[in-house]
């Protein structure tokens, strides 16, 4: 533009140009958005992929100290306008804990793969450790519009000496078990097999990752709902949806395996399924029982965890 060829930074795709938050124009643009949201009585903002928001030469430009300062700055400006700040970032688990102390809420992205690990391995060691250290100011999820983030439980991608919640060989076994449970469907949608922006996510619906086992699916949802935080259920998860291979083949976008377009008739049919009815009952239980405003505790007996309020 301006009759000149200029370089722009696009972390993800050419359709998403990064904002220079160091410039007056870039920062002013962000503040104008916060002004408009505050004036519209919005209660919270979600900073998507904010881990890539700060740039500094000779660094990874991901979750560097400058990123934390940017997050704190946006959080402070949001608070002035009555906005809570929710952070979306897939990263090494200790960085998630650090971020949580600086903002209003974070996503608990470690929980989905940890629950799969517990189901597949029969061990609750890693899950129990996470329960003891995880931030309580979390939005809990099992599934989102993206894949299952195994990066959130593994060792630090930039420093392998920093161990994860689950040893890397066990993370590899977790991924292979998901591929086996989906009869290879998730393998077709993950990594270099399809057009993926993130090679550290396994693309599959959560229900399919569990081999479409109703009991396992409801058990993982129950744990999600019983842990401190605000539970969020993705629309495909609300339908206990299986992988959409037709959409994947049509678009060759890995994440589309978990982005089925439901017709009204399909929704009506799915609402009659016992697993979906049980999930809806569980949602109502979580939303209406006053006990969840109390104090959380848990007990362990062998490989059994009992969560209580």
Regions found by a protein language model. Name each.
Residues 1-309:
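Active-site and adjacent substrate-binding regions of carbohydrate-active enzymes
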């Amino acid at each position: 533009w301006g009759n000149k060829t200029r370089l722009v930074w696009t972390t993800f795709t050419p359709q998403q140009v990064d904002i220079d938050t160091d410039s007056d124009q870039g920062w002013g643009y962000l503040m104008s958005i916060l002004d408009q949201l505050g004036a519209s009585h919005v209660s919270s903002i979600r900073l998507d992929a904010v881990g890539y928001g700060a740039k500094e030469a000779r660094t990874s430009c991901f979750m560097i100290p400058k990123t934390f300062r940017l997050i704190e700055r946006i959080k402070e400006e949001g608070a002035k306008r009555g906005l809570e700040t929710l952070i979306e970032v897939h990263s090494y688990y200790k960085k998630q804990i650090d971020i949580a102390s600086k903002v209003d809420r974070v996503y608990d992205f470690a929980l989905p793969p940890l629950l799969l690990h517990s189901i597949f391995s029969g061990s609750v060691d890693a899950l129990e450790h996470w329960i003891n250290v995880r931030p309580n100011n979390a939005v809990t999820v099992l599934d989102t519009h993206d894949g299952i983030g195994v990066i959130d439980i593994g060792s630090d991608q930039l420093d392998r000496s920093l161990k994860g919640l689950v040893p890397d060989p066990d993370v590899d076994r977790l991924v292979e078990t998901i591929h086996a449970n989906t009869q290879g469907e998730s393998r077709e949608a993950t990594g270099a097999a399809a057009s993926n922006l993130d090679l550290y996510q396994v693309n599959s619906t959560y229900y399919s990752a569990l081999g479409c086992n109703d009991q396992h699916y409801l058990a993982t949802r129950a744990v999600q709902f019983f842990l401190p935080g605000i539970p969020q259920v993705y629309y495909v998860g609300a339908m206990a949806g299986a992988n959409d291979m037709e959409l994947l083949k049509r678009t060759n976008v890995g994440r589309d395996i978990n982005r089925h377009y439901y017709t009204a008739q399909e929704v009506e049919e799915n609402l009659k399924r016992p697993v979906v009815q049980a999930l809806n009952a569980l949602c109502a239980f979580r939303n209406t029982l006053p006990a969840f405003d109390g104090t959380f505790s848990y007990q362990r007996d062998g490989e059994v965890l009992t969560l209580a309020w």
